[in-house]
């Protein structure tokens, strides 16, 4: 219910928020499909996907052949039309409409779409989106409402090898980044249009300016990260305690080296992680335009009995004016690795605020 906490801030309360003596299911009755402000939770879209009554499966996608199954018991699909899109790395390259769907109840029909993949780069991921829409309005649903959809993979994504090369204009020499090691606190890498500072006491990248633009928030550092906020299920399994050693493990800098290799600046930092029985290695490769490739590698002592970790990555804070995100992945709704059927692969552009969903209690 709508509630105010002890500081007078509006919150959505659940069992246990009101007193300590009444029987309660805690947040168990507050994790449904619709939030108290009547906004669908992201998992509502997952449920909607599985509630649909028209299912599309591949027959021979290389030939554009798909199977359409009508799960309805008492109506055919004549009230709907199908829109399809062919996507290459998230970009729509072909579209079409099938207006006559002759599929009886509980029957499957094969349909051939005029898909042509011959002139599409073989390195790109190919996806087929299909959507079934109403030809005419029905009760509360206007004409054109999508009542079922599917996304089929024609060609899987192949991640390119992550290479960092210098950018060379025609007939102009490459200006190799210089490394300044005459400051007591900072190792500085300078290029034609960029400057980067590494903290000599912990080895972390702590300043990154390109073309006069500050890429990192003042006081921020690019640091290793092995933690995320535990979810409700994590708490139920006690993972916040089992994995606690990874929340802020000690990272003792044992080596900070630098060199110019292949006309690029390279900074290497090594760390001892006694609390988890491991060693961490960070390598920063910087080209002539200030682009950075960061590699993080960990060596674990197999004789040490250490818990698993929530995640393995890096984090930093960016200036507030970096408030838009463009990505190729699942969206536009928030989704998990095991709850993403309702989120299609595509190219999406969102604000940072739109990337966040305020779960009352993340499950």
Show which residues each predicted segment covers.
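Exposed beta-strand and adjacent loop surfaces of beta-rich binding modules
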Residues: 63, 79-83, 127, 186, ...
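Short, hydrophobic/aromatic beta-strand segments
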Residues: 75-82, 96, 304-313
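Short amphipathic, basic-aromatic surface patches that mediate peripheral association
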Residues: 70-74, 300-302
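Intrinsically disordered, low-complexity Pro/Gly/Ser/Thr-rich segments with frequent PxxP/GP/PP motifs
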Residues: 81, 87-124, 132, 140
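Edge beta-strands of extracellular beta-sandwich domains
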Residues: 139-152
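Extended substrate-binding grooves/exosites of carbohydrate-active enzymes
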Residues: 1-65, 73-78, 83-93
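Conserved, mostly hydrophobic/aromatic
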Residues: 47, 68, 130, 193, ...
């Amino acid at each position: 219910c709508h509630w105010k906490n002890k500081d007078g801030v509006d919150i959505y309360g659940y069992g246990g928020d009101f007193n300590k003596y009444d029987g309660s299911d805690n947040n168990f009755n507050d994790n449904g499909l619709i939030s108290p402000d009547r906004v669908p939770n992201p998992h509502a879209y997952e449920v909607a996907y599985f509630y649909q009554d028209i299912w599309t499966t591949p027959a021979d996608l290389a030939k554009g052949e798909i199977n359409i199954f009508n799960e309805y018991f008492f109506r055919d699909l004549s009230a709907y039309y199908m829109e399809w899109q062919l996507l290459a790395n998230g970009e729509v390259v072909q579209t079409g409409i099938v207006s006559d769907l002759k599929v009886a109840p509980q029957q499957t029909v094969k349909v051939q779409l005029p898909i042509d993949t011959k002139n599409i780069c073989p390195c790109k991921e190919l996806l087929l989106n299909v959507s079934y829409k109403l030809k005419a309005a029905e009760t509360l649903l206007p004409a054109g409402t999508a009542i079922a959809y599917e996304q089929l993979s024609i060609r899987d994504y192949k991640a390119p090898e992550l290479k960092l090369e210098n950018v060379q204009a025609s007939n102009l020499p490459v200006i190799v980044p210089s490394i300044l090691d005459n400051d007591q606190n900072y190792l500085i890498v300078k290029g034609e249009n960029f400057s980067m500072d590494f903290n000599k006491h912990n080895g972390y990248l702590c300043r990154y300016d390109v073309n006069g633009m500050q890429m990192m928030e003042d006081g921020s550092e690019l640091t290793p990260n092995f933690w995320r906020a535990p979810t409700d299920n994590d708490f139920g399994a006690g993972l916040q305690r089992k994995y606690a050693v990874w929340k802020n493990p000690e990272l003792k800098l044992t080596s900070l080296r630098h060199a110019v290799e292949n006309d690029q600046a390279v900074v290497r930092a090594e760390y001892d992680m006694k609390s988890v029985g491991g060693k961490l290695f960070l390598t920063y490769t910087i080209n002539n335009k200030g682009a950075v490739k960061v590699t993080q590698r960990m060596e674990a002592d197999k004789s040490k009995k250490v818990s698993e970790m929530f995640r393995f990555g890096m984090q930093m804070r960016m200036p507030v004016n970096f408030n838009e995100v463009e990505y190729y992945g699942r969206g536009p709704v928030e989704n998990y690795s095991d709850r993403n059927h309702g989120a299609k692969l595509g190219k999406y552009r969102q604000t940072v605020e739109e990337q966040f969903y305020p779960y009352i209690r993340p499950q």
